[in-house]
């Protein structure tokens, strides 16, 4: 598998590429990070507009970069592809890494050579004198107030760091975990680390507390890493592969990392800003409320406090930020692009899957539509349960709709037609109770625990129905071709207005 592999060394390389293609605009006016930047970015994103570099945000000498991944194409560019459709190749790569197969012969081995070459880029490369450590701040010089951290919505509890790349390592693991966990600012050197209990960072912290009770847990937070590293942290990377390794595959070059000053954690060498510090045992604080990707404010809940004891940064750093709100927002756009990555991964496990679609209106992952080549009675239910169980990204998907391969999974007119003509509610709804649900989903009766429902909107096979199944109406192919030939000459829409 060959890829374009755009080798952006850092965020600034990516900014230059976007600006050259008219995909980024510089904003010279002084705009307030308190609410105003959210409104500007939201209007721009909803119009499929460019990334925005606010050069003079009010109250800060540090520029703010927003709406970076505000279109699927910019996500694709960040992953080294030129189009959203090409992201299927990223999924093919991930599927082969998740379940590698030995070559079936010499010819197959030669065909796999490009993949083997790419694997050489997986191991990160440690460097010294990294750009991210050009300036080092300690003690009283540490002040998060120097950065234009957004307060996104009127009901938010305060400023929120929204694109933090959090690096952790558990006591039993050699590899580090990278994840995006938002952080509420509660002091000049303190934030609240909001991570859910099943996320990698939270699991590392739990294991650390068990193995080393009473000891502070080292954490590093990179702000403004290169696009491959950032996107690697939100992609369904196999458990055997580090996010740094996957970023190297995307980039076509090994990820450069550098050791932290306060710990042995490794951070992206080209990051704009790095926060180093510790989680101290027993120190928690109530987080929220904040406007979230659901379009609602989330509930207040306690999470660990992150105490920052060192900040390193590049000369003239850039602060990367986003906002979340009712779709479409940046997470929804990321979901649309990453949807293409998921398809080959599912198809590797379930070859009968034709397409898989996460509508952005479904808050990125809460509703999925799957089209499949049905082969036996009960087959749709097998695929349904496969979606819920195969990738952890879909453990929170509340609604799964399964349709036949003659239905376009991305066309609601097709999907609704299939649901209303191929479903009997009593037979074709599968309801599961007491399953894991996103704790932000206030519709569930208990926080973190709720129900899921599957819709079997496929043709029914013997054993699923006793009736003769309906035959879809289709025009004869020869008639369609004949009408295609004479269509323009009929002049039916000639001179029509609008």
Swiss-Prot record:
Membrane topology value: Peripheral membrane protein
Principal EC category: lyase
Domain of life: Bacteria
Catalytic activity, as annotated: a 4-hydroxy-3-(all-trans-polyprenyl)benzoate + H(+) = a 2-(all-trans-polyprenyl)phenol + CO2
Listed InterPro entries: Hemopexin_CS (IPR018486), UbiD (IPR002830), UbiD-like_C (IPR049381), UbiD-like_N (IPR049383), UbiD_bacteria (IPR023677), UbiD_Rift_dom (IPR048304)
GO molecular function: 3-octaprenyl-4-hydroxybenzoate carboxy-lyase activity; metal ion binding
Function according to Swiss-Prot or TrEMBL: Catalyzes the decarboxylation of 3-octaprenyl-4-hydroxy benzoate to 2-octaprenylphenol, an intermediate step in ubiquinone biosynthesis.
Oligomeric and partner information: Homohexamer.
Protein's recorded name: 3-octaprenyl-4-hydroxybenzoate carboxy-lyase
Name of the gene encoding the protein in the UniProt record: ubiD
């Amino acid at each position: 598998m060959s890829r374009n592999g755009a080798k952006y060394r850092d965020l600034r390389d990516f900014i230059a590429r976007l600006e050259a293609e008219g995909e980024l605009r510089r904003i010279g006016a002084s705009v307030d990070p308190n609410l105003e930047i959210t409104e500007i970015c939201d209007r721009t994103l909803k119009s499929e507009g460019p990334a925005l570099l606010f050069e003079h945000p009010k109250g800060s000498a540090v520029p703010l970069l927003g709406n970076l991944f505000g279109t699927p194409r910019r996500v694709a560019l960040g992953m080294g592809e030129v189009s959203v459709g090409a992201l299927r190749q990223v999924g093919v790569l991930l599927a082969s890494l998740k379940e590698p197969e030995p070559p079936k012969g010499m010819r197959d081995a030669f065909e796999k050579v490009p993949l083997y070459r790419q694997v050489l880029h997986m191991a990160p490369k440690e460097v010294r004198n990294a750009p991210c450590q050009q300036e080092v701040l300690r003690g009283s010089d540490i002040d998060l107030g120097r950065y234009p951290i957004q307060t996104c919505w009127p009901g938010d509890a305060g400023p929120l760091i929204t694109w933090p790349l959090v690096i952790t390592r558990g006591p039993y693991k050699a590899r580090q975990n990278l994840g995006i966990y938002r952080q509420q600012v509660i002091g000049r050197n303190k934030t609240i680390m909001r991570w859910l209990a099943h996320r990698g960072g939270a699991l590392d912290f739990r294991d650390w507390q068990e193995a080393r009770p009473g000891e502070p847990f080292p954490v590093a937070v990179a702000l403004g890493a290169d696009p491959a590293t950032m996107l690697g942290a939100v992609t369904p990377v196999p458990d055997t592969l580090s996010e740094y390794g996957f970023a190297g595959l995307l980039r076509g070059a090994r990820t450069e990392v550098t050791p932290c000053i306060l710990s042995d954690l490794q951070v992206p060498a080209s990051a704009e800003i790095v926060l180093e510090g510790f989680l101290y045992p027993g120190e928690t604080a109530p987080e929220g409320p904040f406007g979230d990707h659901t379009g609602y404010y989330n509930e207040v809940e306690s999470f660990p406090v992150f105490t920052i004891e060192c900040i390193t940064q590049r000369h003239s750093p850039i602060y990367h930020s986003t906002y979340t709100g009712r779709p479409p927002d940046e997470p929804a756009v990321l979901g649309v692009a990453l949807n293409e990555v998921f398809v080959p991964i599912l198809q590797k496990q379930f070859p009968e899957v034709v397409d898989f679609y996460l509508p952005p209106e479904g808050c990125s992952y809460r509703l999925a539509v799957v089209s499949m080549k049905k082969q036996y009675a009960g087959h749709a239910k097998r695929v349904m349960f496969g979606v819920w169980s195969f990738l952890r990204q879909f453990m929170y998907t509340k609604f799964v709709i399964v349709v036949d391969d003659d239905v376009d999974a991305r066309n609601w007119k097709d999907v609704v037609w299939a649901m209303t003509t191929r479903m009997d509610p009593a037979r074709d709804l599968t309801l599961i109770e007491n399953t894991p649900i996103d704790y932000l989903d206030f519709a569930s009766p208990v926080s973190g625990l709720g129900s899921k429902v599957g819709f079997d909107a496929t043709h029914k096979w013997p054993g699923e129905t006793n009736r003769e199944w309906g035959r879809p109406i289709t025009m004869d192919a020869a008639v369609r071709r004949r009408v295609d030939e004479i269509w323009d000459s009929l002049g039916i829409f000639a001179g029509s207005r609008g």
